[in-house]
Amino acid sequence: MMADKTSPMITSDHSISNFSTGLFGPHPTVPPDVGVVTSSQSQMKDLFGLFCMVTLNLIALLANTGVMVAIARAPHLKKFAFVCHLCAVDVLCAILLMPLGIISSSPFFGTVVFTILECQVYIFLNVFLIWLSILTITAISVERYFYIVHPMRYEVKMTINLVIGVMLLIWFKSLLLALVTLFGWPPYGHQSSIAASHCSLHASHSRLRGVFAVLFCVICFLAPVVVIFSVYSAVYKVARSAALQQVPAVPTWADASPAKDRSDSINSQTTIITTRTLPQRLSPERAFSGGKAALTLAFIVGQFLVCWLPFFIFHLQMSLTGSMKSPGDLEEAVNWLAYSSFAVNPSFYGLLNRQIRDELVKFRRCCVTQPVEIGPSSLEGSFQENFLQFIQRTSSSSETHPSFANSNPRNMENQAHKIPGQIPEEQA
């Protein structure tokens, strides 16, 4: 188990100065002053870093648990099975992976050593849970693609058996790749223990470290990025096309032309009604113009890239170059930037959804003595919210009225204000 550096360390043929571990390439020897704070400034920096890591860990645990509870206790939210699965994976990351990352990254734990088994478990959890989370995000994007671009096919084929099958496939593929870190090659030489700060993804004695590095980056990052970008681009095109097909705001009687032929009225399939009786709909110019839809998708895809791109580039570069010196601060930064994905995922895939938020408010109202009122959904909400409701398969009832082109003029006649001199329409 983990031990303090002051206690005797178990080694076979090498001293602690020869420790070199990981998956991809050689690592510098353990410096004699590991974990020693040299100044008050560095101590404050280390303390701030520890605070940020612990905060991210707590946010990941609480936020993902909250979204899971909201989905589990509401039958109408069962359609978010993949979102619930993502939150469950991120909870595992918050419980198993992130605490080990704190021990490995923080100088306050610089005197801690791992046994070889413990270090292997840490490396295994890194590959397994990271791949599991990324695969689930990819599955969510593909599900949204089929729901919006191919809705009929989605309704027929998206069954509970298919959802369970996809989840089992995700777990199997993640486990298969992670097992390579345990049985693929002996990455630790003849060592029997290792400093926790040197238990890293990018170090290995094996000549296959470069092959695994490329495989890890292509399968776990490059392929998911291509899939996510492609499907959300298709979703954007469909959303843009649907918005442009919506009829803009109907002019009032005062704005209408006073002279109209009877033939125009007969051929028209739309009854002239005032905007006061017309349901308030967001026009395409207000909802999708100016690149706002692209900006929303940029937030979703950009969050994934910001969290994971530096992580994979760093470890790929370190493994291919075989660098003997690892910049510790940079490695900690890219690792925890990647781990921050576990804390922000529930916001991007759960809390931005109005139905899940409302369910969380209801749950809070049940837990506290003072009731919390849920305000009505606003039709004039932010574009990001409206677009996310579209791609996340939710919308308020007031946002789902049929368009004019599909409405029967006879059915709307009783709801329209009678306009003086209006010529009644005849059915085609």
UniProtKB/Swiss-Prot annotation:
Ranges in the topological domain labelled Extracellular: 1-46, 115-120, 184-210, 315-428
Keyword field: Cell membrane, G-protein coupled receptor, Glycoprotein, Membrane, Receptor, Transducer, Transmembrane, Transmembrane helix
Transmembrane segments: 47-67, 94-114, 121-141, 163-183, 211-231, 294-314
Annotated Polar residues bias: 398-414
Sugar-bearing residue positions: N18
Protein topology in the membrane: Multi-pass membrane protein
Region Disordered, annotated ranges: 398-428
Chief location category: membrane
Cellular localisation: Cell membrane
Database matches in InterPro entries: GPCR_Rhodpsn, GPCR_Rhodpsn_7TM
Membrane side Cytoplasmic: residue ranges: 68-93, 142-162, 232-293
Pfam entry (one): 7tm_1
GO molecular function: G protein-coupled receptor activity
GO CC annotations on file: endosome; plasma membrane; receptor complex
One GO term (biological process): G protein-coupled receptor signaling pathway
Protein family: Belongs to the G-protein coupled receptor 1 family.
Protein name: Probable G-protein coupled receptor
UniProt organism field: Oryzias latipes (Japanese rice fish)
Origin organism lineage: Eukaryota, Metazoa, Chordata, Craniata, Vertebrata
